[in-house]
Amino acid sequence: KPAETRFGLKAPALPHMLGATYDFLSNTYVHTHGATVSYAYFFDGRNGIHAELAYRSLESASASERRADPGTSVDIFAVIPHYERRFYIQRMGSFYFVRGGLGVNVYTASILTDVGKSREGLAAPVVSLALGLDFRVSRNLYLEVAARYIGDFASWNFGYDSEPLLANEGFFGGFSVGLRFGLGR
């Protein structure tokens, strides 16, 4: 059962959670989509304090001709250490919680143009913001719907040229939908 805190909030008494989401992110020049799989460990289940490790793979659906050759694709392979504080709310007997998080991501990316040129690079640090709802579907299963913002505040490209690794300095906004499964108690 969810554990009650001194603030009257609720949290699942599950130390481990596995997640899989489908992500839609875009900025002025690039629209991306892809999947994220994650593992979260709750240090304090009562207050929703946990650390999360995720792997994210995105590919662009379109690119602007102003910043990239037509047909450019952007593949992002990410390993994302993530720390997050979760806030839980109980409503009308249907358990869900609101969550907000701040994390630092380190990822590698490769860009392949329509003429076969490729470049690779490393971008860090990246700040990831998330705010969403997790609805309880069954005892340990949750449906996650989240708004996401990813900001690349410093890019270094070790490959093809010295342009920013991602268009518009790598700032993306969008949303995710997926499932999370709790393990443990």
Where are the predicted features?
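Transmembrane beta-strand segments of Gram-negative outer membrane beta-barrel proteins
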Residues: 7-24, 98-102, 172-175
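Internal, hydrophobic beta-strand segments that form the core of beta-sheet-rich folds
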Residues: 146-149
